[in-house]
Amino acid sequence: MSRADPGKNSEPSESKMSLELRPTAPSDLGRSNEAFQDEDLERQNTPGNSTVRNRVVQSGEQGHAKQDDRQITIEQEPLGNKEDPEDDSEDEHQKGFLERKYDTICEFCRKHRVVLRSTIWAVLLTGFLALVIAACAINFHRALPLFVITLVTIFFVIWDHLMAKYEQRIDDFLSPGRRLLDRHWFWLKWVVWSSLILAIILWLSLDTAKLGQQNLVSFGGLIMYLILLFLFSKHPTRVYWRPVFWGIGLQFLLGLLILRTRPGFVAFDWMGRQVQTFLGYTDTGARFVFGEKYTDHFFAFKILPIVVFFSTVMSMLYYLGLMQWIIRKVGWLMLVTMGSSPIESVVAAGNIFIGQTESPLLVQPYLPHVTKSELHTIMTAGFATIAGSVLGAYISFGVSSTHLLTASVMSAPAALAVAKLFWPETEKPKITLKSAMKMENGDSRNLLEAASQGASSSIPLVANIAANLIAFLALLSFVNSALSWFGSMFNYPELSFELICSYIFMPFSFMMGVDWQDSFMVAKLIGYKTFFNEFVAYDHLSKLINLRKAAGPKFVNGVQQYMSIRSETIATYALCGFANFGSLGIVIGGLTSIAPSRKRDIASGAMRALIAGTIACFMTACIAGILSDTPVDINCHHVLENGRVLSNTTEVVSCCQNLFNSTVAKGPNDVVPGGNFSLYALKSCCNLLKPPTLNCNWIPNKL
């Protein structure tokens, strides 16, 4: 480093960067070696014998150097020692023929890379479309799923291209209609809402006449939950009703499409079966690792590997950008319809596919700046939905995959509706649409690394599931033993945790539309889910489903063994969420680690979010109860005990079959009908059906 001449004194001022080239004097080191000796520069100042010193200085006024200026000196090789440019050209000419051709090809590809890339994609797309057409020509019914997926993909690709290129033009084209709608929306919205309400009332009246009154009970339960949310709202006078009504409306439309229309039901049923088939491939890895008898330890070696496999697939889809694309589309739909903020929409859409601790990572940079209502909505969305990684585990329990998939989709708008009613927005959101919709593709460098990271990241989840089940089931056994011991002091040893929950949650389960005799059983399942976790609840539900499928007696020693199909369906929707006290700690810890500055707000709103998430699941179950076309259980006592001659109708046959299955016959004159039926009803069924499983001659003639 060299400094300016101290004799030159100039005042400090802002200076410009300058590059000064000047010859340097030869050093003693150069004179000691004859090969590097130079003539004195004053006597011979030729470019070939001089060195160039580049010095970058900060120049002052009139180019004078300052005392405190810093100068950087870079010594370069003498010009005379540089290789002649002719040598470079000679090396260039010495390249081989193949190397020159390779360089030519690379240069051509660089110049025409856009055209080449477009050509390759066009060839691949043409080949794929040719395969789709050929598959449809061979067997259209078999190729229908591929055809539909192809059409949907092409539609969204074209849509994204048009929106990216002509979004402003489309917006300008539609702006006159939007302005016209805004001018008349004040009175038009009342016409729209009144028409919708009248249509719902008319539809419910006709549907109730067709399927029974239980569907009407589900509608009453939906209204009851909305009233409760409004009464206990954080700011009941500040409720913005658009997201509430639109959330329930989207729930209803999705449920109507899936549960009542044949194309929708067939599509989701097909998706459910494909998911089950896809999850079945987990058995190959489990069999290789744990051996042929891996099913002997069903949960550890059959269920938990599904979580690993599903986590791997989700990580790969996230690397490819497909998950982010789907989340953006679903979030955009909820944003434009419900009027929710971009942050809320993205997180609610993300919770359909990923867990309650992963979805906030989609908007991690914005969490310190969200409002309290938005933070409450983020937590509510996590409690009201389940993760895709555990969805496969619930399906493997034997729970309907169609209903689980439907519940996962319907719960997203329900969470937004409940959250905005239970904690209305009183501040102005700071995050815009474009900033919230930006999502990263992860830190994986290739697809295999993404798969490996997905499998590795599932290890804590699998360990957490296994550890929690061991702890909670052991705790449940202890609590039941303690309650039984306490109840025995009052001559009631039947006291248990399930019994207490059945009375606490029975009104809620009944108002969802569950049959009265099944409401206590569903209430027990809700208790398992709320105080332990949904794994315990779905495990008990799967046992009830298996007992029904086994067609055993519905009552054994006066104890009901299983539920109706309608009650199972409603219970599936009510349990489909992470709303439990175990998840409460997970959410508080996870969000606090992401946004430490919001720790106080997270802790204060978590309990309300847990309640809101639970009610969101209940409202989804109410929608399922309204739209479910599964016939409710027949009042068999009214059918069989009315004293009339029985006719061979579907209702009578069903009631008689249930009566035969629940009857205990030990011998002549020793027959006990099940379900509190009389011997008269049993005799009437015997005269009608002549069952092979029961000796009707054992029934006493004198009744």
Curated annotation (Swiss-Prot):
Keyword Cell inner membrane (UniProt): no
Alphabetically ordered keywords of this record: Cell membrane, Membrane, Symport, Transmembrane, Transmembrane helix, Transport
GO biological-process terms attached to the record: purine nucleoside transmembrane transport; pyrimidine nucleoside transport
Compositional bias of kind Polar residues: 44-61
Intramembrane segments: 345-363, 523-542
Cell compartments where the protein resides: Cell membrane
Residues in the signal sequence: none
Residue spans, topological domain Extracellular: 139-143, 210-212, 263-299, 400-401, 485-522, 543-581, 629-703
Membrane as UniProt keyword: yes
Ranges of Basic and acidic residues composition bias in the record: 1-19, 63-72
Region Disordered, residue ranges: 1-93
InterPro entries named in the record: C_nuclsd_transpt, C_nuclsd_transpt_met_bac, CNT_C_dom, CNT_N_dom, Gate_dom
Family recorded in the similarity comment: Belongs to the concentrative nucleoside transporter (CNT) (TC 2.A.41) family.
Annotated NCBIfam families: nupC (TIGR00804)
Functional summary from the UniProt entry: Sodium-dependent, pyrimidine- and purine-selective. Involved in the homeostasis of endogenous nucleosides. Exhibits the transport characteristics of the nucleoside transport system cib or N3 subtype (N3/cib) (with marked transport of both thymidine and inosine). Employs a 2:1 sodium/nucleoside ratio. Also able to transport gemcitabine, 3'-azido-3'-deoxythymidine (AZT), ribavirin and 3-deazauridine.
Protein name: Solute carrier family 28 member 3
Taxonomic placement: Eukaryota, Metazoa, Chordata, Craniata, Vertebrata
